[in-house]
Structures are given as structure tokens and as C-alpha cells.
Amino acid sequence: MAREATIARTTNETSIQLSFSLDGEGKAELETGVPFLTHMLDLFAKHGQFDLRVDAKGDTHIDDHHTTEDIGICLGQAIKEALGDKKGIKRYGNAFVPMDDALAQVVIDLSNRPHFEFRGEFPAAKVGTFDVELVYEFLWKLALEARMNLHVIVHYGRNTHHMIEAVFKALGRALDEATMVDPRVKGVPSTKGML
């Protein structure tokens, strides 16, 4: 069974078509209208070996908030749908990624209990025209809609771009690990018998 999903979401603020495959080749076709987010999603797909297609149109003439947040919502929904019943998955993923001066860690539990924790501070409020606070909004909506427990720690760094890049690379690697199928796992990886 293919572990993939397609999500469509239209509001008065955004229109998004998103396709996602867990068992991909790291290919991304991205039209987000938010150049820095496009760059980060490309890294996420490449380092997680996911295939990701996003066609988003939003009210970026106001700012990037709605588009960034809604792409996070759609990607989270796609991850949840692509996982199906979660039988055989590892469930947990952990990745440290350095990017020059920066070091980030992402830890995931695909528990069906959404939670988000973020530790770290970015030196700059913007990268180009992108509001750095939107990284938090994107990740929180992703965790909520994917129903994952997501912990993100930016241990240190001087360059905000490098720090965020390390986060998105680590996110891809941690999610790849958590979604891997382990032949030793019979059913779902929980003593409850369900996730």
C-alpha cells in the first residue's frame, strides 16, 4: 500500500494543493509564494527522502503568515493520512543536524497525542522578508495536524538562516526515522494496541 496523501484546502486567505509521499526519493516541486519557506521545505523533503509537491496561493501581499501556517496544516494532514494505521512503524525519531555555526535537534513521537515544544532563540527577527516567528507557527500547526509529539531544540548558532535550516533538515531526518517500517514490529508500536 502506497504511503502517500493529497490534501486540498481553500479558505478566504489561501488555496493549497499538496501531495506527499513518505516513501519517496527526496523530490520537491514547490510553489509556495514564500521563497524562504520554499527553500526550507525543499531541505525537509531532500533530507527525509520524501516526495513533496505544493502549489499554494495566499494573501502574501499582507504578509506570509496565513500561507506559511496553512501549508503547515496541509502537510500535517498529509503526514497523518499517509501513515494510515501506523502498523510496523518505528514511531520515534531523533536527529541532530549541524549547519556551520548552528546545531539543531528534532525529536518525534508519532503518538496520536499532538504536542509541540520549542527551545532556542534566533538572533534575527527576519531572514530576508520572512518573519522568523513563522517557523514556530508552521511547526506547531504541523504537529497538531499530524497528531505528533514534536520537540525542537536549537542548541546554538549565530546565523538565523543556518539555525532554521538545521531545524528543517533535522525535521526531515527525524520524521524519516519515525516513519520507517521495522519488520520486527508486529502491529502498532504501543502496549495499548493502538496509536
From Swiss-Prot:
Q: Which Gene3D superfamilies match?
A: Imidazole glycerol phosphate dehydratase, domain 1
Carries keyword RNA-binding? Answer: no
What InterPro entries does the database record attribute to this sequence? IGPD_sf, ImidazoleglycerolP_deHydtase, ImidazoleglycerP_deHydtase_CS, Ribosomal_Su5_D2-typ_SF
Q: Which reaction does it catalyse?
A: D-erythro-1-(imidazol-4-yl)glycerol 3-phosphate = 3-(imidazol-4-yl)-2-oxopropyl phosphate + H2O
Concerning SUPFAM superfamilies, the annotation shows: Ribosomal protein S5 domain 2-like (SSF54211)
GO terms (BP aspect): L-histidine biosynthetic process
One GO cellular-component annotation of the UniProt record comes to: cytoplasm
Q: Cross-referenced CDD domains, in alphabetical order?
A: IGPD (cd07914)
Q: What is its main location?
A: cytoplasm
Pathway assignment = Amino-acid biosynthesis; L-histidine biosynthesis; L-histidine from 5-phospho-alpha-D-ribose 1-diphosphate: step 6/9
State its Enzyme Commission number(s): 4.2.1.19
GO MF: imidazoleglycerol-phosphate dehydratase activity
Q: Name one Pfam family in it.
A: IGPD
- Name the keywords, alphabetized: Amino-acid biosynthesis, Cytoplasm, Histidine biosynthesis, Lyase
Where is this chain's protein located in or outside the cell? Cytoplasm
What protein family is recorded? Belongs to the imidazoleglycerol-phosphate dehydratase family.
What is this protein's record name? Answer: Imidazoleglycerol-phosphate dehydratase
